[in-house]
Amino acid sequence: MKQLLCYLPWLLLLSLVVSPFNEARFVVEKNSLSVTSPESIKGTHDSAIGNFGIPQYGGSMAGTVVYPKENQKSCKEFSDFSISFKSQPGALPTFLLVDRGDCFFALKVWNAQKAGASAVLVADNVDEPLITMDTPEEDVSSAKYIENITIPSALVTKGFGEKLKKAISGGDMVNLNLDWREAVPHPDDRVEYELWTNSNDECGVKCDMLMEFVKDFKGAAQILEKGGFTQFRPHYITWYCPHAFTLSRQCKSQCINKGRYCAPDPEQDFSSGYDGKDVVVENLRQLCVYKVANETGKPWVWWDYVTDFQIRCPMKEKKYNKDCAESVIKSLGIDSRKIDKCMGDPDADLDNPVLKEEQDAQVGKGTRGDVTILPTLVVNNRQYRGKLEKSAVLKALCSGFEESTEPAICLSTDMETNECLDNNGGCWQDKSANITACKDTFRGKVCVCPIVDGVRFKGDGYSHCEPSGPGRCTINNGGCWHEERDGHAFSACVDKDSVKCECPPGFKGDGVKKCEDINECKEKKACQCPECSCKNTWGSYECSCSGDLLYMRDHDTCISKTGSQVKSAWAAVWLIMLSLGLAAAGAYLVYKYRLRQYMDSEIRAIMAQYMPLDSQPEVPNHTNDERA
C-alpha cells in the first residue's frame, strides 16, 4: 500500500501533464553538421543537440570521425579495452561515433570524454526523425558524471550513421565540421531569454543543479540586464487538475484556485511536509516579484529575491513559508502590498491572470516548441540544449547578439578567442598610427574600417582603409606626406573632398609618398628683380635688396626705403595744409554771406521806421487829417 501511495503523485502528475498538452509539439533543437571528406558522403546534414555537456554556441569545431572496433555503444569505459581517442599534436580533434542503445546517452558521452574524445556523435538505431538526447531523471549515480561532461554531443539519423561507418570501414578519412553558429538566432543588439524554473528545493538532483545555476549566473544576468543588453523573464511550469478530480485529496493538496494551477508534492508524500500548493503559491509570489520589480524599471531584483529566498527560506529548515518570503521582500525594499495584490486569492474559484499567462506560455509558438523539460532555457525563442552552467549559458546568450554588438562580458578570454591577435585577423591596419579594421566578435571577427576620434575611415576593411571627411588630416596626416625640419612642419593633407593629398606651396611631388623642396632661386620662380639677391630655404626662399632698398614680396620688386618715407611725409603735410585752407575758405564764405544777410535786414528795419521803402506800401497818416 505504501508503495502504491508513492506512485500516486506520479500518476496524478501524468494526468496533469497530459491534459494541457494533448496537442503538444516538442521541437528538437539542431545544429549543422558538414562532411568535408571523403567526396562520396560530402555534404551538410542536421543533428540534434544533446541536452547535456557544453555545445559551442556561436562557434564551430572541425574533427576526424572515429568508429571504435570495440565498445561501439560506449556503455563501458574505453580504458577497459586499452583504447584512447586523444589527438596527436598537430592532428584534428577526434569525434567519436557510437551506437544508440543499452545505456543512457549521457553515459556514452562521459565514457568517450574520459577516453579523450572532443565530441560524440550518437547514431540512432531506429529509422525516425531526430530526437533530443536528455539526461536520466532523478538518477543519483548519473548526476555525479553528468555535471562533469564538458564536450558537445549530437544525435544523427540511422541512415547517416550507416554512411559514416561504411566510409570509415572502407579506409577513408572522414572529416567534418560541427557548426553551432546558427543554432541561436542573432537578429539585433539585444537578446531576449527566459528561464523556466521552480521554487521547490527538495525535488532532487535537477533542483539542486537549478539552484546552483541561479546563484552562479545572478551576477552576469544582472550586468547584462542593467546594461540593456538583455531582456530576461522568468517562467514557472504549472498544470491543472482534471475537473473530475478537483475534490480529491491529491488535487486539494497540490493545487490552488480549485484545481486550476498545480505542482507535484515536494516530498511525494501527501501526509507530511509541504504540499504542491505551497510550491504553486511561492512560484506565484516569485512571478509577482518580477512583475512589480519590472514595473519599477528594476527587473534584475528578481535574481536577488530568488537567491535570498533559497538561502533564508529552505524547505529542510521548515522556513519555506509566507512569513520568511515577506521578510526577504522587505529587505529588498519591494512593496509587499503590490505583491499581495498581484497574487490575488489562491482559494478563489477564479482564474489567476498571472498563472493563466504561464500556462499559455508553456505552449510553443513559431519555431519554439512546448516547454516540457524543467528547467528549460529559451534564448531568442530557441530552446537551449546543454549543461545548465554559467559559462555554457553565457555562450548561448552571447551567440544571440548581432555580430559586433556583443557586450564586453562576451569578449573576455574565458568566453572566446580574440582572432584579431593573430596576424590582425587578416584585416587592414596602420601600425604607425595603431589603427586596425579588425573587430573582435563572439563568433570570430569582422574587418570593418573604423571610426577614430570622430573621423570615419572608408575602404573594404581588408586591404584598404583611409580617413575621410572633416578632420581626416588629424589622423596620421590623412595618409599624406608629412615632414618636419628645424621646427618647421609641412603636410600635404588637404581637407577637401575632391583633393586628398597635395604638396604645399614651395614643394612638388605626388603628395602621398614624396614632396620635394622647390629651389625658387635656381628655377627663377621668385626674387628676380635687378636689385634682388635670392637664397633658397626648405619650403620657401629669402630675398634681399641691395643698398637702401626694401623687397616687396607680392610684387617681386625692390623700392627705396628713404624716398618713400620723405614723399609720404610731405604728402601728408600738404594734404593737411590743403585741408585746413579749404576749411578756412569755406568758413569765410559762409561767414560773409550770413553777415551780409544779417546787416541788410537790420538796416532795412531801421530805415522802415522813418521813411517808406520801395518794397513797402504807403501807410495813411490819420493824425494829420484830424488836425486839418
Curated annotation (Swiss-Prot):
Q: Signal sequence span per UniProt?
A: 1-24
CDD domains reported for this sequence: EGF_CA (cd00054), PA_VSR (cd02125)
Sequence ranges on the Cytoplasmic membrane side: 591-628
Q: Where would you find this protein in the cell?
A: Membrane; Golgi apparatus membrane; Cytoplasmic vesicle, Clathrin-coated vesicle membrane; Prevacuolar compartment membrane
> What InterPro entries does this protein's entry cite?
cEGF (IPR026823), EGF-like_Ca-bd_dom (IPR001881), EGF-like_dom (IPR000742), EGF_Ca-bd_CS (IPR018097), PA_dom_sf (IPR046450), PA_domain (IPR003137), VSR_TRX (IPR056858)
Question: Membrane-spanning residues where?
Answer: 570-590
Q: What is known of its domains?
A: The tyrosine-based internalization signal may be involved in trafficking at the TGN.
Family designation: Belongs to the VSR (BP-80) family.
Protein name as it appears in the record = Vacuolar-sorting receptor 4
